[in-house]
Regions:
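Acidic, polar-rich low-complexity tracts and alpha-helical solenoid repeat scaffolds
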Residues: 4-5, 72
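A short alpha-helix-loop-beta-strand transition element characteristic
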Residues: 66-73
């Protein structure tokens, strides 16, 4: 029996904003498989690799993990400030080198990730959705700038952070 069921509580609702390299791939699959979490959306952001590559990785991971009924959207293709630094030596040319991934398991929504985040936050009860950025924080910053009236509706932000300075040191 899950912790949520034992405590008679609802799963925590999350939006996963990611740049799937190896770490984010694990985070996505764990979020989907965890009965204490309700994955409301997956958004991608340029980070470990280009937006095109990390989005393709996220779509392939949806197939691998059997993720269904969750909207996916691509977001920011570059950082807000400075050039994008791609650590090919860490995550490889694809951003997820190693496994041979299948073709996309889900179609992308016809909207920008920032707008999908806003739609989900607006649709759900205030204070019930946690943002979980595991990559660059560009989409989260753009969400706060574009939709300041929705920021107070966010339950919180749980992030996997890096460092200021050279990427992936």
């Amino acid at each position: 029996m899950s912790t949520s069921a034992a405590n008679n509580t609802q799963p925590r609702k999350i939006i996963l904003d990611c740049d799937p390299g190896h770490d984010d791939a694990i985070a996505m699959l764990l979020a989907w498989g965890n009965p204490n979490l309700e994955l409301l959306a997956v958004t991608t952001v340029a980070g470990n690799q280009t937006l095109e590559k990390v989005t393709k990785n996220a779509q392939a991971l949806a197939r691998v993990g059997g993720i269904t009924g969750v909207p996916f959207a691509a977001g920011a293709h570059r950082p807000l400030v400075g050039p994008q630094l791609i650590p090919d030596e860490i995550h490889g040319e694809s951003g997820l080198d190693g496994p041979q991934l299948p073709e996309a398991g889900v179609e992308l929504e016809d909207t920008h990730a920032v707008d999908l985040i806003a739609q989900v936050i607006e649709r759900e009860e205030p204070g019930t959705v946690t943002l979980v950025p595991t990559g660059a924080l560009t989409n989260i910053g753009l969400f706060a700038r574009r939709y300041p009236e929705l920021v107070s509706r966010v339950a919180g932000v749980t992030l996997m952070g890096g460092e200021i300075g050279r990427a992936h040191v």
